[in-house]
């Protein structure tokens, strides 16, 4: 096992490393978004090199980090991180609204996102929400709850990561894939038993059993499968 205690540089951000590795053989250490938030882990590269990551607690790996470099053999190990896409909601236009309307919209948006159990980070007049369901479903949630006046778009997680602090990155990406899917899209104008889009959660209780919840509005019916 090769112990990694320091990051040598980043090939995505540093022109010096870009030049060094231009004609080099690059072995990738592929991490998902949860693994990338850990300062300590053990994993093999695509070429089978056994690495033990032991970084300072405040240091997390980023896409493009160079972990090893052998100038003689012209071989480097570089981190590749697979991050989820992110929905970016632009709140800038709310600055032109009255204070009452701004407060009301922000409260309702927070309630809508929280009701879906979606993680979010607010920064630079924007809200970042990692995708845990299809973009069409997230689009439906925004429009059905009346937020179509707020510009929103879907971008790669790698575009957002450089804008975040380590703690914000952990909140946004750490374990987002384990968030229980819990999507309810139903217009306030619908009848109590009207049709709507209902995507329900599958919960695991750590005992080897899981069940899904099927909720209906009005009368509350639950269908449990063990």
From Swiss-Prot:
Localization annotation? Cytoplasm
**Basic and acidic residues compositional bias: what residue ranges?**
204-226
**Stretches the record annotates as Disordered:** 192-226
| InterPro entries named in the record | UreE, UreE_N, UreE_N_sf
Q: Name one GO molecular function term.
A: nickel cation binding
Q: Does the keyword Transmembrane helix apply?
A: no
Main localization category:
cytoplasm
**Alphabetized HAMAP family for the sequence:** UreE
Which protein family is named in the record?
Belongs to the UreE family.
Protein name (database record): Urease accessory protein UreE
């Amino acid at each position: 096992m090769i112990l990694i205690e320091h990051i040598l540089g980043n090939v995505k951000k540093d022109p010096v490393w870009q030049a060094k590795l231009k004609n080099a053989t690059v072995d990738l250490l592929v991490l998902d978004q949860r693994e990338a938030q850990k300062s300590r882990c053990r994993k093999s590269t695509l070429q089978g090199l056994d690495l033990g990551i032991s970084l300072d607690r405040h240091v997390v790996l980023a896409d493009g980090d160079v972990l090893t470099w052998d100038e003689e053999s012209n071989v480097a190990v570089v981190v590749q991180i697979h991050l989820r896409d992110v929905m970016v909601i632009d709140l800038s236009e709310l600055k032109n609204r009255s204070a009452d309307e701004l407060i009301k919209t922000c409260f309702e948006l927070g309630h809508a996102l929280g009701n879906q159990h979606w993680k979010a980070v607010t920064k630079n007049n924007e809200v970042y929400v990692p995708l845990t369901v299809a973009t069409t479903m997230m689009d439906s949630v925004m429009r059905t709850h009346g937020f179509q006046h707020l510009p929103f778009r879907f971008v790669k997680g790698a575009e957002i990561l450089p804008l975040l602090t380590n703690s914000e990155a952990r909140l946004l990406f750490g374990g987002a894939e384990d968030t229980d899917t819990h999507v309810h899209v139903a217009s306030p104008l619908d009848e109590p038993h009207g049709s709507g889009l209902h995507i329900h959660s599958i919960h695991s209780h750590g005992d080897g059993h899981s069940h899904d919840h099927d909720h209906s509005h009005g009368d509350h019916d639950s269908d449990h499968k063990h």
